[in-house]
Each structure stands twice: as structure tokens, then as C-alpha cells.
Amino acid sequence: MRTQWPSPAKLNLFLYITGQRADGYHTLQTLFQFLDYGDTISIELRDNGDIRLLTPVEGVEHEDNLIVRAARLLMKTAADSGRLPTGSGANISIDKRLPMGGGLGGGSSNAATVLVALNHLWQCGLSMDELAEMGLTLGADVPVFVRGHAAFAEGVGEILTPVDPPEKWYLVAHPGVSIPTPVIFKDPELPRNTPKRSIETLLKCEFSNDCEVIARKRFREVDAVLSWLLEYAPSRLTGTGACVFAEFDTESEARQVLEQAPEWLNGFVAKGVNLSPLHRAML
């Protein structure tokens, strides 16, 4: 039997770089919120212990794909603690809607969905804390998708505090370029000393993203899309880009602006949600 599992996008409603550690990682403060839009992962259980990704990504080796890595990590962790039923395996496929290198968390969300779904389907019984800890070894954004609630993140993104920001409507636009995260974080002009503030203070301030100035400077496509969106609504970069988003109070307002978009602007409208569609599907 094949089951389908949501793998939602996320937005960074704000992102501030507060420092850089000796190991090179940047410390930050950011606000994650999910979208009711994303990829869909289909899973069919196998009884011979094999993991097979039926929809490979061009240019990514099978064993390097985050989906496969997540499945194998769960398999090993559960087996090591005697919680993996004999023969547990899976055929996995993905209906990919989220762009790579877009700042929407697609790969991290895929990994989290696989961890949560296979833990349920294989009946391993690992806790959310255990799954989140495993997820952190796959990527800094994986734990928030595992836990499934909008969150204020600190440290390198691993310290999560659940929050409930307003659930607005967003026009999310992809400028047609992919921005590797290191390109932004290695830029010498990236702001790295934004003062730390409490979540209460940050929620009262106008939101912004410290990475935006670098993305706009280095990628004219990002600058062009943001310049157009800013004529209609508050707009900013998500993550390290390349996607940008404009926020609206209603779906109709967002769709009206999308209908006016120039042909070169590729976008979609989605609602911000504080409970992940993955976790809603499991209720």
C-alpha cells in the first residue's frame, strides 16, 4: 500500500546574523513559519530491508540524496536500539514542487518527512526529540520540520522556541537562479554583528533579512523581483535565497498581484501556517 506525506515549504519571516563561531558557523536569530504548499512524498513499504528512491534527482547520487540519507539514518538508529522490525524497507518517490537552492527548505523538509513518516510506518517508536536530534545531523533546518510548529530559532538554528506569528498570505516568487548557501555566508560584506534581541522585541519590530543585501548585490534577478514586489507589499528574502516573498492579509490580494506579475516572474500564492501540514496529516 502506498501512502502520501506532505513535505511543506518554510519561510524565514526574519533572519538576523548575530555572530560567527570559531568553527566558521554563523549564529543567528530567525523566525520559521510553514506554508500550506510543498512537495509530496509517496512511500510504499518493502519487507526485504531495501531503501529505493524511485525519483532520482539529476546530478545527485542515490546515496547522497537527503531522502535516502534520512531513511538510512532512521534505519540504523532504530536498529542499534532494537526498535527496527525485521525486513523494514521502503520505495520512496517525490512529487517535487519546491526549487532547489530557493531558501524554502525543500531538501530539509523532505528529510524530515521521511524521518517522521518511516518512524510511523515502521512502528519504530522513536520520540520527536530523537528524530529532531537525528535531523540536525542532516541539516540545521531539519529539526523545525520534524517538530512541526512555527518557531523562533537561535544558535546555528538548532535552539527552537515554538511561537505563533500571524498566519498571513504570501506571494512567493522564484527569480530563476539557485543560490548556494555558502555564497552568501562567505561574502565579506555580510552583516555578522546584528545585536541579539528577545523574541518579544523582535515580533514588535519591522522584519528583515540580513542576507538580503548580499543576495540583491550578487544576483540581479533577486534584486529585480524584490524591486517589483516592493511596489505592492512588504517583501523580503527567505533564508539565503533565492526565493523572495510578499505578505498580504488576504488570498485575493495576493492573487491579484500575481495576476499582474510580468512574464519573467515565476511565483505561487500560499498561506502561512503555524502547524506543519505534515503534522496536520497525522492528527
UniProtKB/Swiss-Prot annotation:
It comes from the Bacteria. Keywords: ATP-binding, Isoprene biosynthesis, Kinase, Nucleotide-binding, Transferase. GO terms for biological process: isopentenyl diphosphate biosynthetic process, methylerythritol 4-phosphate pathway; terpenoid biosynthetic process. Pfam families: GHMP_kinases_C, GHMP_kinases_N. Pathway: Isoprenoid biosynthesis; isopentenyl diphosphate biosynthesis via DXP pathway; isopentenyl diphosphate from 1-deoxy-D-xylulose 5-phosphate: step 3/6. Its EC number is 2.7.1.148. InterPro entries: GHMP_kinase_C_dom, GHMP_kinase_C_sf, GHMP_kinase_N_dom, IspE, Ribosomal_Su5_D2-typ_SF, Ribsml_uS5_D2-typ_fold_subgr. It catalyses: 4-CDP-2-C-methyl-D-erythritol + ATP = 4-CDP-2-C-methyl-D-erythritol 2-phosphate + ADP + H(+). ATP binds at P99, M100, G101, G102, G103, L104, G105, G106, G107, S108, S109. It is an enzyme of class 2 (transferase). GO terms for molecular function: 4-(cytidine 5'-diphospho)-2-C-methyl-D-erythritol kinase activity; ATP binding. The active site is at K10, D141. The keyword Chaperone does not apply. PANTHER family: 4-DIPHOSPHOCYTIDYL-2-C-METHYL-D-ERYTHRITOL KINASE, CHLOROPLASTIC. Catalyzes the phosphorylation of the position 2 hydroxy group of 4-diphosphocytidyl-2C-methyl-D-erythritol. Homodimer. Belongs to the GHMP kinase family. IspE subfamily. This is 4-diphosphocytidyl-2-C-methyl-D-erythritol kinase. It comes from Shigella dysenteriae serotype 1 (strain Sd197).
